[in-house]
Amino acid sequence: MLPYNQKMFADELNELGTYWLEKLPNVSFEETLLSCLTHRPYGTQPGHAYFYYPQKYGYGEVWIRMAKELAPQVLYGMEAADLDCEKRRVRTKTGEVFEAEHVITTVPWHSFTQITGMPRDIRGLLAELRSSAIETRYVPKCLSTKAQWIYEPDPQIPWHRILVRHNFCPGSRGYWLETRKERVQMLEDISVKFPGNAEDNAGRNDILLNGSDHGDAGYHYLNEYAYPLNTIGKPEAMNRLLAFCRARQIYGLGRWGEHCHYNSDVVVELAMQMARRLLQS
């Protein structure tokens, strides 16, 4: 795992805490070996061992249906810029101003241009929050593999993970390359071959198109806020930040509001729990 994590986090790997390991199965060497031999899971499963998504459609279906129910209260194309903690006021980058009894923020805290009404020591916590940027790039071809996810620890290969879409979702085509922002340029220059014999690399070399193919593969998007990093001291910093804001009816929610590595199914559950609490208050 070390080569993969060095590739994922680069120099930031040494800044990470250990509290996030609760997301991983707790297994011994014997249990790992037994899992490989029997093709069955062993060991203690993490708190989030199962993922819950709609049985039909994609997980985006949740947001599509919510938007229909909430329209016209849903406003698109507006980006929050300033937050006033005393007045519970949000100003967008285009100048619109909103005030509310309760403010729920799901955006990265360090993406606000300005936060007022917050003491300097609390505001200083924002500088401690770290995140990574990831490019997702679509390649319109199929791979000769039955895998849904492929993890790539080789530092000579730009991407760290592949979502094999045609195995993941019935009727779909192609696959997605996930590449850390700092390694994206390598996609344009790639001209490598995997080491080892052909049998070991069955399906692996299919991924290596030439540089022009990757450059013109199709849709690609750089997400500047892909993952919050679980750095040392982050839980304590977020507890202080969220407690201060909560006392002023401002709530951080979800992956970015809580700066916690949640998947979307967990965020939906947390949002429903918060809605119930606010309705009862």
Regions found by a protein language model. Give the residues of each.
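FAD-binding beta-loop-beta segment adjacent to the flavin cofactor pocket
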Residues: 223-259
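Active-site/ligand-binding neighborhood in enzyme catalytic cores
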Residues: 1-88, 106
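Mid-domain catalytic core of redox enzymes
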Residues: 81-88, 92-207, 219, 237-244
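A conserved FAD-binding loop/helix module that cradles the flavin
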Residues: 253-279
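General small-molecule cofactor/ligand-binding pocket signal
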Residues: 73-77, 216-219, 251
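Active-site-proximal substrate-binding core of FAD-dependent oxidoreductases
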Residues: 220, 279-281
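Conserved strand-to-helix beginnings and helix N-cap segments that scaffold or border functional pockets
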Residues: 187-190, 231, 264-265
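Aromatic-acidic/polar surface patches that form glycan- and anion
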Residues: 52-59, 96, 128, 260-267
